């Protein structure tokens, strides 16, 4: 049995995530900030995550597709019905931030929204050049497929709320696989935003 883990800031809960996988999940948090003026040049910042495994990119794209299918259908998050929401569009800056965080978690063997160097999701997103008014992040580990990761997030009230939030318009997904030397092997980050 694979151990799937999906965490956002808050108290730990244990829940079944479908597909024979179990997950540990936390409550979700969204952050809001005034839209920043100007554009941050982020090409050098994102250099280490531009070239990516084709298989990993396919997984990331599948997550976007699955999330948009869930948004189009509407969903129940923690017993509360969420109406259908507009499709999210891929944002390469958010993908850069998500990839950097998944890579950091896998290579440095940790699982948290806070990076190994103390960075926050907000700092990664800004460093990648995304000026936002609202952002949210879902992370997961141990899920071996995009479907399992999305199912795990949808089974968590906070993660589901992030996915179904109609105010969020953009998504970047980062997937990183490290078979040996990491705790969970599969690491996922979803960074959502609105400008």
PLM regions with names:
Residues 91-144, 163:
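Short, surface-exposed glycine/acidic/tryptophan-bearing loops
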Residues 43-45, 132, 140-195:
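Disulfide-stabilized extracellular recognition modules
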Residues 44-108:
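A short alpha-helix/helix-coil micro-patch that ends at or immediately precedes a cysteine
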Residues 24-51:
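Post-signal peptide N-terminal segment of mature Sec-exported envelope proteins
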Residues 18-21:
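Bacterial signal peptide processing site
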Residues 13-16:
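C-terminal motif of bacterial Sec signal peptides marking the signal peptidase cleavage site
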Residues 1-7:
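Bacterial N-terminal signal peptides that target proteins for export
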Residues 77, 111, 159-161:
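Bacterial peptidoglycan biogenesis and beta-lactam-recognition machinery
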């Amino acid at each position: 049995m694979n151990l799937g883990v999906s965490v956002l800031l808050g108290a730990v809960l244990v829940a079944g995530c479908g597909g024979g996988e179990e997950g540990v999940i936390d409550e979700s948090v969204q952050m809001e900030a005034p839209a920043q003026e100007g554009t941050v040049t982020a090409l050098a910042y994102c250099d280490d995550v531009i070239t990516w495994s084709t298989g990993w990119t396919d997984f990331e794209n599948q997550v976007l597709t699955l999330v948009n299918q869930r948004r189009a259908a509407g969903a129940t998050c923690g017993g509360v019905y969420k109406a259908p929401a507009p499709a999210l569009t891929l944002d390469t800056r958010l993908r850069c931030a998500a990839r950097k965080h998944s890579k950091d978690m896998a290579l440095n063997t940790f699982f948290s929204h806070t990076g190994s160097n103390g960075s926050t999701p907000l700092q990664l997103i800004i460093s990648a050049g995304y000026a936002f008014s609202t952002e949210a992040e879902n992370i997961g580990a141990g899920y071996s497929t995009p479907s399992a990761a999305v199912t795990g997030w949808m089974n968590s009230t906070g993660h589901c709320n992030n996915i179904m939030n109609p105010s969020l318009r953009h998504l970047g997904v980062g997937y990183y696989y490290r078979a040996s030397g990491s705790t969970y092997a599969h690491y996922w980050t979803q960074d959502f935003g609105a400008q």
